[in-house]
């Protein structure tokens, strides 16, 4: 009987793949033989002659109705570039909102246009380009509809934009060398356009405007025709860099060092769809410092990757999730456990596609530093497309310490099934993996597995998962938050749209349960959350009220902070939570998090606030503050974490940013300042100043200063 049920479900899913075909809107690109003036003015004859994409429909607030303002998109191309011209008509041009100028700044609070291009027409991956009326550039790489785009991908492209009496317009230039596509005489690409009108909190799309779709759902995108004889060729990019600086230690043994370093990166197009990258003497002086956090849990904190060499192509290497065992975590390469840099001598990477296969190879050699020996890191990833949007893949990693014979290996297989027309117009995702490791001295109990079922839709948004991480599962180039556990959980969310009292969507969550045991079945952690009320307003504000109940079993004393210890035992505690967030289009926006109630053998109140002030198009200031007031059986303590970012943009190519942070655990004030100039596309100049002060005696005491000037230049053939 069970086999019959499984067979029927499988047939139903396959039927969705076979019959889920629909007519797609088409835009045709026009080839031009003469050059155009790239200035943001779409007044040349070739622009007027190109047929536009129109008929945008609302996704929000009135789903399926025509957009309240007209949008026209035209596409031209020549031998080297793709040109996209966008006319965003607006009946109230004085009300257009555009605050951002800085490259890769968050455009969510601005009027904007977003373009997604699926060059492989695989309905899975796409290049994302977005801009606002100021011509600020944002780009990303879309990996799959169920995942957020990789916002750290940075392509070489340009945009000019301006506000006009009729609205605003943008002219976008994308070199074909920035994209990857098949070597064919005629190209047909997937493409979609999204416009946001902030003052109306309106989202318009050319295609895929249903609530259960959106700009990231490439299976719902339209198509771009008319592209012939595109030559990407064997692209070669050469990025030499030079760095000069001074480091001064102001501690008990003052010292001063001159910093000099040169190196280069090379990018080579092996085929039109496969790219090789090489790096020598890699440097990341311009990368912003991590936001330091006080860890009040028993497990390691996860920090995101920020280094550009490891960000490009990161989606191909992705395997697993950090909370359930991540086989590859690039921060294990070139960074120590406490975030200090370890020199990278050289590295090579191959990423791209070959037919239905996605390929990723990475080989990096690090130098020794202090007690950390040099090591070689190798990662191999292979993934094959299945059906319309699904895929199956394999991964292998190796860490080798030369001269010692020490080798750590990890390997795994994963399957991702995604259906965007399940039961008609619903989304369903099923994914899972199994992985194992081989470590000298560890035998058996070295596996991890996971299954995840997600039903991410507008009215009902539900998921279920189960995973296991055995005690000897040890991917040394990966991340494992917790071992020797089995964890099962899920959530059920109901999100109706009442259309009254200024409420766009209500969010009810009667079930959100995580149940964790050790491998033997002994309960370790239970987390349950009930959301009796949550809502999103028509103006874009968000509110939620949650009731939570937690169980924790401590099998050893837990030193939570300084000399405060929670003893072995079983603990049940209840707590209440409120979250509120305003729309980022406002001059002053922010978010509030408040949680209070039981905490092990005492009480805790958590207060977290984030604010963003957009003083003008050029200047922004953000502030975040997190405060814990904890009372335990052995005494009380408070934690404080402060952080502030200040940014000033002189133009879209010249900006400064400062990041200041402090917490009362490290008792250090950390300043990270960066000036960034883009003299030409792909080339950069940085001026970086870092200063660390100790504050333990309630006075500022300088401990470390670094001043660096760095420049790189792009040569492209």
Identify the residue ranges that each predicted region occupies.
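Catalytic-domain carbohydrate-binding cleft regions of carbohydrate-active enzymes
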Residues: 253-257, 261, 265, 275, ...
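Structural preference for beta-rich elements and adjacent junctions enriched in aromatics
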Residues: 21-385, 393-394
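Bacterial N-terminal signal peptides
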Residues: 6-15
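Outer-membrane beta-barrel transmembrane domain signature of Gram-negative proteins
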Residues: 208-232, 366-424, 542-595, 606, ...
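Structural beta-strand/beta-sheet cores of well-ordered domains, especially the beta-sheet scaffolds
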Residues: 25, 69-73, 80-82, 111-113, ...
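Positively charged n-region of N-terminal signal peptides that target proteins for export
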Residues: 1-5
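Exposed, low-structure sequence patches enriched in small/polar residues
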Residues: 343, 421-717
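Sec/Tat signal peptide C-region and signal peptidase I cleavage site
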Residues: 16-20
């Amino acid at each position: 009987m069970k086999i019959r049920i499984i067979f029927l479900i499988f047939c139903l899913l396959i039927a969705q793949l076979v019959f889920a075909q629909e007519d797609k809107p088409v835009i045709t690109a026009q080839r031009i033989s003469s050059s155009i003036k790239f200035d943001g003015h779409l007044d040349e004859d070739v622009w007027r002659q190109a047929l536009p994409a129109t008929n945008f429909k609302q996704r929000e607030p009135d789903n399926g109705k025509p957009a309240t303002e007209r949008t026209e998109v035209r596409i031209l191309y020549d031998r080297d570039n793709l040109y996209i011209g966008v006319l965003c008509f607006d009946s109230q041009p004085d009300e257009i909102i555009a605050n951002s100028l800085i490259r890769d700044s968050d455009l969510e609070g601005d009027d904007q246009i977003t373009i997604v291009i699926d060059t492989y027409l695989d309905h899975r991956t796409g290049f994302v380009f977005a801009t606002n009326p100021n011509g600020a550039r944002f780009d990303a790489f879309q990996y799959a509809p169920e995942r957020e785009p990789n916002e750290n991908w940075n392509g070489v492209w340009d945009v000019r934009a301006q506000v006009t009496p009729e609205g605003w317009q943008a002219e976008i230039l994308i070199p074909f060398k920035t994209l990857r596509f098949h070597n064919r005489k005629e190209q047909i690409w997937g493409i979609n356009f999204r416009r946001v009108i902030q003052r109306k909190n309106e989202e318009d799309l050319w295609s895929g405007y249903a609530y259960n779709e959106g700009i990231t759902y490439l299976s719902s995108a339209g198509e771009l025709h008319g592209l012939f004889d595109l030559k990407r060729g064997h692209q070669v990019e050469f990025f030499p860099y030079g760095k000069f600086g001074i480091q001064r230690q102001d501690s008990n043994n003052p010292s001063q060092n001159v910093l000099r370093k040169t190196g280069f990166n090379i990018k080579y197009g092996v085929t039109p769809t496969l790219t090789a990258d090489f790096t020598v003497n890699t440097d990341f002086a311009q990368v912003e410092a991590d936001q330091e956090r006080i860890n009040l849990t028993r497990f390691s904190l996860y920090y995101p990757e920020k280094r550009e060499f490891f960000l490009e192509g990161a989606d191909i290497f992705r395997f697993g999730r950090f909370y359930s065992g991540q086989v590859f975590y690039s921060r294990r390469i070139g960074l120590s456990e406490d975030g200090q840099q370890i020199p990278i001598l050289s590295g090579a990477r191959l990423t791209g596609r070959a037919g239905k296969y996605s390929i990723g190879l990475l080989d990096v050699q690090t130098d020794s530093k202090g007690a950390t020996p040099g090591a070689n890191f190798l990662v191999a990833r292979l993934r094959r497309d299945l059906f319309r949007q699904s895929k199956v893949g394999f991964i292998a990693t190796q860490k080798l310490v030369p001269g010692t014979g020490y080798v750590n290996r990890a390997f795994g297989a994963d399957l991702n099934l995604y259906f965007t027309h399940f039961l008609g117009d619903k989304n369903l995702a099923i994914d899972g993996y199994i992985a194992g490791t081989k470590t000298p001295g560890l035998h058996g109990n070295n596996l991890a597995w996971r299954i995840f079922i997600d039903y991410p839709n507008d009215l009902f948004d539900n998921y279920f998962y189960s995973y296991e991480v055995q005690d000897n599962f040890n991917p040394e180039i990966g991340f494992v938050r917790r071992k020797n556990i089995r964890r099962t959980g899920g959530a059920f969310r109901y999100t109706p749209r009442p259309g009254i009292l200024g409420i766009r969507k209500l969010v009810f969550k009667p079930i959100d349960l995580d149940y964790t045991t050790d491998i033997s079945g002994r309960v370790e952690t239970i987390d349950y959350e009930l959301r009796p009320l949550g809502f999103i307003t028509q103006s874009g504000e968000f509110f939620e009220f949650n009731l939570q109940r937690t169980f924790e079993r401590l099998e050893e004393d837990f030193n939570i902070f300084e000399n405060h210890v929670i003893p072995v035992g079983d603990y049940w505690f209840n707590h209440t939570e409120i979250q509120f967030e305003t729309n980022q289009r406002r001059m002053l926006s922010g978010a509030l998090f408040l949680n209070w109630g039981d905490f092990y053998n005492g009480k805790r109140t958590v207060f977290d606030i984030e604010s963003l002030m957009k003083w003008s198009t050029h200047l922004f200031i953000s502030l975040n503050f997190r405060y814990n007031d904890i009372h335990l059986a052995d005494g009380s303590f408070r934690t404080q974490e402060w952080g502030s970012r200040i940014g000033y943009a002189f133009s879209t190519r010249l900006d400064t940013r400062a990041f200041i942070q402090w917490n009362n655990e490290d008792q250090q004030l950390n300043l990270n300042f960066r000036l960034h100039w883009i003299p030409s596309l792909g080339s950069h100049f940085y001026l970086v100043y870092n200063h660390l002060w100790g504050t333990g005696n309630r006075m500022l005491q300088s401990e470390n200063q670094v001043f660096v000037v760095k420049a790189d230049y792009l040569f492209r053939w």
